[in-house]
Amino acid sequence: MGLISGILFGIIFGVALMAGWSRMMTHRSSKRVAKAVDMKLLGSLSRDDLKKICGDNFPQWISFPAFEQVKWLNKLLSKMWPYIAEAATMVIRDSVEPLLEDYRPPGITSLKFSKLTLGNVAPKIEGIRVQSFKEGQVTMDVDLRWGGDPNIVLGVTALVASIPIQLKDLQVFTVARVIFQLADEIPCISAVVVALLAEPKPRIDYTLKAVGGSLTAIPGLSDMIDDTVDTIVKDMLQWPHRIVVPIGGIPVDLSDLELKPQGKLIVTVVKATNLKNKELIGKSDPYATIYIRPVFKYKTKAIENNLNPVWDQTFELIAEDKETQSLTVEVFDKDVGQDERLGLVKLPLSSLEAGVTKELELNLLSSLDTLKVKDKKDRGSITLKVHYHEFNKEEQMAALEDEKKIMEERKRLKEAGVIGSTMDAVGMVGSGLGAGVGMVGTGIGTGVGLVGSGVSSGVGMVGSGFGAVGSGLSKAGRFMGRTITGQSSKRSGSSTPVNTVPENDGAKQQ
């Protein structure tokens, strides 16, 4: 009896033990599944969602990294960099040199690479963020840092000197957006779109050093190069502008990837008030330049000896992306050599409502970069009338063709020597964008004009660096003419480039 009861007890105990073990494992498994579900749910919550749930008990140590680290990719990039650098050097030279020529500042006759190597230090990818905004595309944002040791020497030629300039201590901080257009054929990518995000703002730091000379040999050279680099980045690479690269030889329509005009901004530059005088004798001769993209820059006529000029000239500018682009207005004093800026202001297009005309009075600033603003004095204001018109499909295609025609006309006139650069501000001819452009060079254009004064007249060069007789002397002459002869000084003329269309023809008067 004792043996049988012992066997039964053992069987019952074993079954109970197995049942208990099975139940415990099932419970642990269900807890793991529930925990995984909770973690998945928490992982999908944003910082704001967690703050709503936790309230005042929200842990400050919780972070939400926007970019994933890719140490493996940095290791691969460092190994491949010598080969990438050598291949990229020719590509950069072939693609950037034409941009330097198109965007070179007035007064510089040549701007090319004398030396170009990318060095031995590879860029570092701080992180990658993969997103999907549109079907058939994969968008990848790359947080890029590069403190390399490239050897970059620019050959700079001006009217007064020729000097090689070395870019040292180059550092690049930017977030690049790379869009892959997917395809159903190997290599499964038909095109790549590359751009730099506007926010955070791309930062390119460097030091300029003259090789075998001095930067002072060409007055204002450092600022000219800074402006050129900044303009190329903003006008060619910074989103919404982009570079579209076909991949794999797959025939595909890339028109959807290219930047297209969204609308046009009709701007009437009405007047300026209480401008800052930059002249020792007489008053400034102000004119205004306006642009959304620096390569499509237009200017008003110059009003002589007036700190409260009234222009009342209208221009039409194409906008590619209303949400990210801005209208920039700069006021200059027309002078011999380099025209001096009196002030500038920027108006975001996102603040405008389509189909509504606004009249705005905007205060002029010494710089758009608040960190560089040293002069806090009032620089006056400028009054604008603005109207944003959104394009339909037909208007969009017509505007795209007009942009091409304008660029071709600018390049043709640059080659003919009528303007010094495609970046020169010009006046618009006719009522539409397709009517063409009349070229009126900036203060550093080329040409010969008659310079009159209240006392005498003469011939002066409109140029940079060597304008011995020009608007500066004509101002003195006009001042003396007004002082001595009164009304006879009204015949004083300003420098007018030959073989050009008068500026007044370019503006629609209101």
UniProtKB/Swiss-Prot annotation:
Tissue expression pattern: Mostly expressed in rosette leaves and flowers, to lower extent, in cauline leaves, roots and stems, and, at low levels, in siliques.
Region (Disordered): 484-510
Gene Ontology biological-process entries: lipid transport; negative regulation of DNA-templated transcription; positive gravitropism; response to salt stress; response to water deprivation
Gene Ontology CC terms: endoplasmic reticulum; nuclear membrane; plasma membrane
Binding site for Ca(2+) 3: 335, 339
Localization of this protein: Nucleus membrane
Key word DNA repair present: no
Positions of Ca(2+) 1 binding: 278-279, 285, 333, 335, 340
Region entry Phospholipid binding, spans: 226-488
Membrane-spanning segments: 1-21
Binding site for Ca(2+) 2: 279, 285, 333-335
Sequence similarity: Belongs to the synaptotagmin family.
Comment on protein domains: The SMP-LTD domain is a barrel-like domain that can bind various types of glycerophospholipids in its interior and mediate their transfer between two adjacent bilayers.
Function: May be involved in membrane trafficking. Acts as a repressor of abiotic stress (e.g. drought and salt) responses by binding specifically to the promoter of THAS1 to regulate its transcription. Binds to membrane lipid ceramides.
PANTHER family associated with the record: C2 CALCIUM_LIPID-BINDING ENDONUCLEASE_EXONUCLEASE_PHOSPHATASE-RELATED, EXTENDED SYNAPTOTAGMIN-RELATED
Official protein name in the record: Calcium-dependent lipid-binding protein
Gene name linked to the record: CLB
